[in-house]
Amino acid sequence: MEEQGRCACRLEDRPHYEEMVLETMLYSARLKERVARENSAVIVAMSRLMAETFEGGGRVLFCGNGGSAADAQHLATELTIRYRSSVQRPALAAIALSSDSMALTAGANDLGYDAVFARLVEAYGREGDLLVGISTSGNSQSVANAFMAAQERGLKCIALLGGDGGAMKGKADLEIVVPHTGSADRVQECHIAIGHVIIDLVERMLGYCTSSR
């Protein structure tokens, strides 16, 4: 008897796993290429906005849920600690709002989860700061509410979205929508690649990076 939700296929019944690997990774590469070609100017604009935020003494706040929370923490850490060992620079002030489990659980319990990031923006956000919201569907209400709180406080907003952009499309100062639906994984791969390019460009714009790649 098959376990509920488990495919009846077995390892020996599936001789084409290598083709699946190739197909998956080539699709991911093509999707990244499409996003790069369609959004290169936006990525540069995002990088410039972030660099200007740091140069002006501001901070960059990140938020997202699930895998997007992991991306938020990943990128914030690379800004604060280090992106590449070949680049020597001061720490850049970046905060992942998803990293404080006590604040998240207290906010979810006392205010409702959709209000958690907005509350943290109220606590930490100041005019001249920048909020980066990440949502693979574009429908994360907690991130959308954080944008509203940020804009009320004079923060600029960047959105990394997926699918058709969802309810968050058009709500940020700058946005990129990864045109993939049906799963979050390929969108997440593009989001982290975009984030890495932005950090690289920010370091260059601030005069810290001189390497070619």
Curated annotation (Swiss-Prot):
This protein's name: Phosphoheptose isomerase
Span of domain SIS: 50-208
Disulfide bridges in this chain: none
Annotated positions binding substrate: 65-67, 78, 109-110, 135-137, 140, 188
Localization per Swiss-Prot or TrEMBL: Cytoplasm
GO-annotated biological processes: carbohydrate metabolic process; D-glycero-D-manno-heptose 7-phosphate biosynthetic process
Superkingdom as given in the UniProt entry: Bacteria
Cofactor: Zn(2+)
Enzymatic reactions: 2 D-sedoheptulose 7-phosphate = D-glycero-alpha-D-manno-heptose 7-phosphate + D-glycero-beta-D-manno-heptose 7-phosphate
UniProt source species: Chlorobium phaeovibrioides (strain DSM 265 / 1930)
EC numbers for this chain: 5.3.1.28
